UniProtKB/Swiss-Prot annotation:
Family to which the UniProt record says this protein belongs: Belongs to the CvfB family.
Source organism of this protein record: Staphylococcus saprophyticus subsp. saprophyticus (strain ATCC 15305 / DSM 20229 / NCIMB 8711 / NCTC 7292 / S-41)
InterPro entries tied to this protein: CvfB_fam (IPR014464), CvfB_S1_2nd (IPR048588), CvfB_S1_3rd (IPR048587), CvfB_S1_st (IPR039566), CvfB_WH (IPR040764), NA-bd_OB-fold (IPR012340), WH-like_DNA-bd_sf (IPR036388)
A Pfam family of this chain: CvfB_WH
Domain of life per record: Bacteria
Name of the protein: Conserved virulence factor B
Amino acid sequence: MAQDEKDIVGSIEFLEVVGLEGSTYKLKGPNGEEVKLNQSEINDEDELQIGEEYSFFVYPNRSGALFATQNMPDITTNKYDFVKVLKTDRDGAHVDVGLPREVLIPWEDLPKVKDVWPVQGDELFVTLRIDRDNNMFARLATETIVEQMYTPVFDDEKQNQVIEARPYRLLRIGSFLLSKYGYKIFVHETERKEEPRLGENVSVRIIGHNEKGELNGSFLPLAHERLDDDGQHIFDLLVEYDGELPFSDKSSPEAIKEIFNMSKGSFKRAIGHLYKNKIITIESGKIALTQKGWGRIEK
């Protein structure tokens, strides 16, 4: 492939319409490149005119032949955005960038630990890249790129707010997140129980910011909302039994011991803490998870 031809791939270009064969237009690039256009990829109701130039996005098909579309993708070789993961396999993550074909993020660019690979529905912050053989891939944004693009926050406006964001970089020391509003958030390893997936939609509580306007966050609940061992055990059993158990502070010590393996006093203290923090309700001789309680499962 000639260098000039490579320069138009993955970008938006003005191409001249030089012919029509069946349902396929023939286009010519600025340096004489031959590009094809299927009629289904025209967004103008009027037919294209032979000899006229129009704006198109140029991309290679799986065989490397150049095609064009007027349906502009979410990303280009000069533009980054979040794109949805369609599937993952041994080759890497296949993503939807708004083109007639899916695009691959090679496995070499994903985390070494497959447990934190993205799954279908996750979204990754990427750009397009074209290799020497005219193959098109998606590339994860680097820390340098995010540093140039994030929206800084220099006050305490976001303090204790819960923000939805997605991890774009995962390290042993912590998780680096980016929100759809451009906030850059770092969650130290001590502020998480487990590492999120790359691209997973997570809720993070803001606990501070630094001099560069980067936010610090936590996946852990506030200290007064954290559960002790007994509270966590009751919570886990509630989740296991679809959020409801026929027990209350009126239940017998024997029944409590049999199911929860704790004394009645410990049980009453634990459900009292859960109730105070609106994690459960206690009524009609039973305990049940609240909406807030169900929400803790994601944490």
